[in-house]
UniProtKB/Swiss-Prot annotation:
Cystine connections: none
A molecular function GO annotation: structural constituent of ribosome
Gene3D superfamilies hit by this protein: Ribosomal protein L10e/L16
Keywords assigned: Ribonucleoprotein, Ribosomal protein, RNA-binding, rRNA-binding, tRNA-binding
Gene: rplP
Protein's UniProt name: Large ribosomal subunit protein uL16
GO biological process: translation
Lineage: superkingdom: Bacteria
């Protein structure tokens, strides 16, 4: 599972996830990508499940890049615990995703194969995404 090696603080405030992405919206490596069209949170299990789905479909051909990293701790108190007594223990690591953010990139496969593989990955994610190519990347979300 993806998680930071070390952090300055163990726990973090929830924060708000508003607006559009202004970083990670352009192609860096591949020819095809999966771009978020709505806001949400993605955890390390979802990132890994989607990566496995698209890697198995292309039978390890081409190259895949994961453009997101879960760097925010999400805490949870144990079940049937009374309120108070401090913040809960870290349960999982997540990343806030804003519309326009590129999640995965692919290269070295045909467009049809990349579209099908990224569609399989799309179903593993908790927010809406769309398939984009390097030529169509300038379209609005």
């Amino acid at each position: 599972m993806l998680m930071p090696k070390r952090t300055k603080y163990r726990k973090m405030m929830k924060g708000r996830n508003r607006g559009y992405a202004n970083r990670g919206t352009e192609f860096t490596f591949g020819e095809f990508a999966l771009k978020a069209t709505e806001a949400g949170r993605i955890n390390s299990r979802q990132i890994e499940a989607a990566r496995i789905a698209l890697t198995r479909f292309v039978k390890r051909q081409g190259k895949t890049w994961i453009r997101v990293f879960p760097d925010k701790p999400l805490t949870k108190k144990p079940l049937e615990t009374r309120m108070g007594k401090g913040k809960g223990a870290v349960e999982e690591w997540v990343m806030n995703i804003k519309p326009g953010r590129i999640i995965y990139e692919m290269a070295g496969v045909s467009e049809e194969m990349a579209r099908e593989a990224l569609t399989l990955a799309m179903h593993k994610l908790p927010f809406k995404t769309k398939f984009v190519t390097r030529e169509s990347q300038n379209e609005i979300y």
